Regions:
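A general structural motif
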Residues: 30-33, 76-78, 130, 157-158
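Active-site neighborhood of phospho(di)ester-bond hydrolases with catalytic His/Asp-centered motifs
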Residues: 4-6, 34-40, 80-85, 134-137, ...
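Beta-strand-turn-beta hairpins that frame and shape the catalytic cleft
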Residues: 1-3, 126-133
């Protein structure tokens, strides 16, 4: 069994929901082969462009938020994670404001998030599993219709797609045919979010 963890966006995560996810993983440990976070593990609020020149940029909580992630990742027994728009904020912020830090290993996302120490595999291009690919969901345009962002990514990649990003849960097929005969069906699955709002 593969467990997909939706966007946590720590510190905005729903603590009860995350606790229930941790319990589920513990209860089914023997059956689970992978636990994959779908990106946006941290919100990186202080690094966001909307926070620039506002009090949000000066909260000095990023280290604490990262430490919360480490604890949650351990409890969830995360094995893999993929890139996402919120986790991109670290490199983007450094590139825009402090480019001299770009070659500092501690500020590279996998190291900052503690992935090597947690034995978590980092997949910056998404994670391919058989005829599925796990993507964050921001790789192309988004749709307001649940499941449709993932379905469009399925059409684009030619693979079944599971994604986060849009904060909706949905499962939508994309079926092709020729001469009245079905040739294939691809699935787009959006996994929702784990935020407390």
């Amino acid at each position: 069994m593969i467990v997909l963890i939706p966007d946590l966006q720590i510190p905005l995560h729903d603590k009860q929901f995350v606790s229930a996810l941790c319990q589920f993983v513990a209860d089914h440990k023997k059956r689970i082969t992978r636990v994959v976070t779908m990106g946006d593990e941290l919100d990186f609020t202080s690094m966001g462009r909307w926070s620039e020149s506002t009090p949000l940029a000066y909260t000095r909580q990023l280290g604490n938020e990262r430490n919360q992630w480490v604890k949650i990742a351990e409890d969830l027994q995360v094995t893999d994670t993929i890139r996402s728009n919120h986790t991109d904020r670290l490199a983007t912020g450094i590139m825009r404001r402090l480019p001299g830090l770009l070659d500092v290993p501690e500020f590279e996302l996998p190291n900052f998030m503690g992935l090597p120490e947690l034995d978590i595999n980092w997949h910056p291009q998404g994670l391919r599993l058989a005829d599925w690919i796990l993507l964050h969901g921001d790789e192309s345009g988004t749709s307001q219709i649940a499941g449709t962002t993932a379905r469009r990514l399925a059409e684009k990649t030619g693979l079944n797609v599971a994604c986060g990003h849009v904060h909706r849960a949905g499962l939508v097929p994309h079926t092709t045919s020729i001469n009245g005969k079905l040739t294939r069906t691809l699935w787009g699955m959006e996994v929702g979010h784990a935020m407390d709002y």
